Amino acid sequence: MDPYKNRPSSAFNSPFWTTNSGAPIWNNNSSLTVGSRGPILLEDYHLVEKLANFDRERIPERVVHARGASAKGFFEVTHDISHLTCADFLRAPGVQTPLIVRFSTVIHERGSPETLRDPRGFAVKFYTREGNFDLVGNNFPVFFVRDGLKFPDMVHALKPNPKSHIQENWRILDFFSHHPESLHMFSFLFDDVGIPQDYRHMDGFGVNTYTLINKAGKAVYVKFHWKTTCGEKCLLDDEAIRVGGSNHSHATQDLYDSIAAGNYPEWKLYIQTLDPENEDRLDFDPLDVTKTWPEDVLPLQPVGRMVLNKNIDNFFAENEQLAFCPAIIVPGVYYSDDKLLQTRIFSYADTQRHRLGPNYLQLPANSPKCAHHNNHHDGFMNFMHRDEEVNYFPSRYDPVRHAERVPVPPRTLGGKREKCMIEKENNFKQPGERYRSWPSDRQERFVRRWVDALSDPRVTHEIRSIWISYWSQADRSLGQKIASHLNLKPSI
Amino acid sequence: MDPYKHRPSSAFNSPFWTTNSGAPIWNNNSSLTVGARGPILLEDYHLVEKLANFDRERIPERVVHARGASAKGFFEVTHDISHLTCADFLRAPGVQTPVIVRFSTVIHERGSPETLRDPRGFAVKFYTREGNFDLVGNNLPVFFVRDGMKFPDMVHALKPNPKNHIQENWRILDFFSHFPESLHMFTFLFDDLGVPQDYRHMDGFGVNTYTLINKAGKAVYVKFHWKTTSGIKCLLEEEAIKVGGANHSHATQDLHDSIAAGNYPEWKLFVQTIDPEHEDKFDFDPLDVTKTWPEDIIPLQPVGRLVLNKNIDNFFAENEQLAFCPAIVVPGVYYSDDKMLQTRIFSYADSQRHRLGPNYLQLPANAPKCAHHNNHHEGFMNFIHRDEEVNYFPSRYDPVRHAERFPIPPAICSGRREKCGIEKENNFKQPGERYRSWAPDRQDRFARRWVDALSDPRVTHEIRSVWISYWSQADRSLGQKIASHLSTRPNI
């Protein structure tokens, strides 16, 4: 008898109820009592097992991106970029790779409306022949802060007040008033794109700068872009109240129903690349996650397409237990020194170990679909089958060897230990350009949202003045407009 | 140096940032990198500690009642019931006991709108001189099922579909079509009361039948009622969409803002009592949680008042970590053989051990405020200070003794091991009476909500017929009304 053969699964259902040890249950309606009306006996093991499992159904939600929906499909290469990367899954046009995607909101809890003004997560796990590749991004191309050391405090400011549990603008505007690097992100969040219509009608971005490396070891910086073929659509504030008030899961339902109806959402993948030798020629730092790369100088190059054509079988197994991590890459793709990405490499796996346990990468949705081998598997809920006697390395009894060497970025690292900001901050140019690119009604809505936020009675005169100063530095007329609505004089 | 003196607290804040071991942090903005733009060093312990704590901020939400708000105040006895109970906190009019209360919705997740049609939790923890007393009830006086064996499946049916994560009527109406005992609960849930305006404008109930015992050992069955002095107010469907769409935390905010403004919500406590000698004289079983006790025969007796006059200091400590359990009673209050209550005695503590750890009753919000003593404290996160050498019982070195004996119900339990339903089900009378007591517009709204639910395209003809038959048995005109809207003929 092989204990690993009949793994627990819907495929091995008995036609009658049983306990988890397989004992038959002849009455699943009534507890075991003293007589028909007396108290329940402790020996009612079936009842205790049923309740104890139920009592433990919830695991910690994600500290961010708790609310989300997932779906499966494939990625297909449409354009050859093998001169840029040796990644196997990108080796030639026509190559398809299975994947799972999770869309999410960021700040609020599981169950929160999917109509809140918030970035949307856009995380893709490619099950490649060289192991999984997680491209863990958002629907906005930039981020609030450029060093992950600020991330926990940033999230605390955006989350509900720890006393009242209400999200409050004075806390958000206080925190970010110390970090003008956030202006560019706010030019997305407070724009109409701050509330996407649903998960199908939005673009995605890798957000951070990554590195592509080809077989010869040549590295280029890269940014990833997913463009929806459904068109970008957003909800204005009044629509969001009605949609979210009627169904707080409208985007989850939209994704599921679309796929069930055979209306498969699709995104095109594009990249922008930058030779590290040219990185000093820009007026911004290409490792600064608060910047976009101008598409007229660094054009979008098509790579492939992603189609979501299959709904998940079970929400808990393939959404709640689905774990992404930007550290999970494949040969031919590497990190950059982007300080936000560097911290993400640590945090994601760390938080999944808390949520799911040390063996979370064994869970079906997370495990690689290629052959793999190491000695990291004992501990809570190891359900892997291994029959080796040698579980150490190196050994003269075990022929397993190192994999073939994969190229890593060749640049020499040098410098003192530093805790400092980057030099080329350039916080105001891109948000100003973005604002000026809009028609006047879109500018008006943006201004109104800022006026609303700054009108929180607990926002002080000092904080209001700082923000007016910041927006004036991005665009003089924008700062003046906000100030005049608030009856304040801009400080510069 | 006493390691138990300076417990971590806002009261011992340093004026500058430190790590959790107390080391000063001289730069909380930037990670430790190789040069100004290089990768982050593993030795940046401060960064790793900050991220690792952040990564673990969430704990499992409650499997039910995840979404809620809490507040503190006091309970004051206004009427003497010391002839019914020897409970110290009920000993005489004028006696005040500090309390913490948690209101909640039941089915949806932590961030879900507080405008959904759902029962509302109403849980009160009394910090008495004889230990804590948890009265863990709801805003509706009855419950869906009368044996807790059905509870996990019931919640699964009410929760979102495990595939698409959307709450669906066909699953709810399928499950409950097997249990007509749920009809009475549905006359509350699908009534206007199903969406309270907020937590202040609703009543509360102990729901289950408990036992009061006086000094002489005489026991009476008891039901607890909390009557709001603010008046009961509900949201109709259109209002709920607007309120919940505009603020998914409106009830949390209302409770917090009311108390902050000095507008303290208040409830009066009433009891109904039945002498167990008379329990066979009714056409229902008084241990059946799907029944109310008619107030014309068993009148409400006033006991005291509950005033909430203080907001919590911290949402995580006093809401997320706040743990209730109906097993937590004081001398003079006891359980009954109500099969729902019997299972709750096990489940609540079991679930909190999963969520919070084995020492959850040491957490400040959960710990008794009276002197207490036992040997149950080691294990994860034991932070109690104990300096005894004898941590076993009995001992000739330790003078600790048994407490004074307090009375428990004197009834003799006898009977065979049984797994069965109760005899006097009487599922249709009370729901029918309740329906007939309403004005016609309220009856219409109730019928319309049933027609909407039964119109789910996945509700089969069989399920529709079962429900029409059930409602016809409660009230013939109600069944006909639903049937005619659905163009289905009633079966009886």
UniProtKB/Swiss-Prot annotation, chain A:
Oligomeric state and partners?
A: Homotetramer.
EC numbers for this chain = 1.11.1.6
Q: Which InterPro entries match?
A: Catalase (IPR018028), Catalase_AS (IPR024708), Catalase_clade1/3 (IPR024711), Catalase_core (IPR011614), Catalase_haem_BS (IPR002226), Catalase_immune_responsive (IPR010582), Catalase_sf (IPR020835)
Please report a single Pfam family linked to this protein.
Catalase
Q: Kindly give the SUPFAM superfamilies that the UniProt entry links to this protein.
A: Heme-dependent catalase-like
Keywords for this protein: Glyoxysome, Heme, Hydrogen peroxide, Iron, Metal-binding, Oxidoreductase, Peroxidase, Peroxisome
Q: What is this protein called?
A: Catalase-3
Native source organism of the sequence: Glycine max
Give its localization: Peroxisome; Glyoxysome
Give the domain of life.
Eukaryota
Family under the similarity heading: Belongs to the catalase family.
Cofactor field: heme
A single GO CC term for this protein reads:
cytoplasm
The first-level EC class reads: oxidoreductase
**Positions annotated to bind heme:** Y348
| SMART domains listed in its UniProt record | Catalase
Curated annotation (Swiss-Prot), chain B:
Positions that bind heme: Y348
Which keywords does this Swiss-Prot/TrEMBL entry list? Glyoxysome, Heme, Hydrogen peroxide, Iron, Metal-binding, Oxidoreductase, Peroxidase, Peroxisome
GO cellular component: a single term = peroxisome
Subcellular localization is given as: Peroxisome; Glyoxysome
One Gene Ontology term of the biological-process aspect is:
response to hydrogen peroxide
The domain of life for this entry's organism is: Eukaryota
Molecular function (GO) terms for this protein are:
catalase activity; heme binding; metal ion binding
Report the PROSITE patterns cross-referenced here: CATALASE_1 (PS00437), CATALASE_2 (PS00438), CATALASE_3 (PS51402)
Keyword Metal-binding attached:
yes
Family stated for the protein in its record: Belongs to the catalase family.
- Subunit structure comment from the entry: Homotetramer.
In its UniProt entry, what is this protein called? Catalase-4
Species of origin reads Glycine max
Q: What is the lineage of its organism?
A: Eukaryota, Viridiplantae, Streptophyta, Embryophyta, Tracheophyta
Q: Which gene encodes it?
A: CAT4
